[in-house]
Amino acid sequence: TLRRSSAASDVYKRQGYTQPNYSVSAIVNVKSNGWSDSYYKAGDINGDAESTDQYTAIGLRGWWRPESTGSGIPSVSVGYDTTDYDAPNGQSSADAWFVGLNWQDIFNADDRIGAAFGQPTTNESSEVSPFAYELYYSFKPNDSVTMTPAIFAGSDRNGVAGGDVFGAVFETTFKF
């Protein structure tokens, strides 16, 4: 007789290729028999999304940086994730993506200007379309201190339509 294990399972395969100025990678992840990352799940499928028995996620990542810094050409990071959820009453899917840009040594050695934006995975209906971004400038006034002012914002955060946020932060790092 065959027995089906009631234990949760998580199987994944990663593959990547990296060179000094670029990298690409992919991952496939299959979770089944009740393994749960519930806050990443897509909206209800004629029932409770918590009842999802299995899902398959695929993630793609890549980055590239120029041969030299200070040229005005940014390094670039990109990513895309897609997840298909199988539930007793149907199927659903969710996508997420991001793009990051980073300029190094534009004004002074060791400074960085960065921008990132993207759409995180949502567990809500299609009326909710979250979007997030951040902008920052990191600089070193001396060899022991790095200062990084940044602003960030997001729309439809935490799966709530109109749940928008905006903020600023000023990080200071001391090295002794």
Segments (PLM) and residue ranges:
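C-terminal hydrophobic structural anchor segments
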Residues: N102-V145
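Transmembrane beta-barrel strands of outer-membrane/channel proteins
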Residues: A26-V30, V76-T82, V99, I113-Q119, ...
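Predominantly the C-terminal beta-signal and adjacent terminal strand-loop region
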Residues: F131-F176
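Residues on the lipid-exposed face of transmembrane beta-strands in outer-membrane beta-barrel proteins
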Residues: K13-Q19, L60-W64, Y80, V99-W103, ...
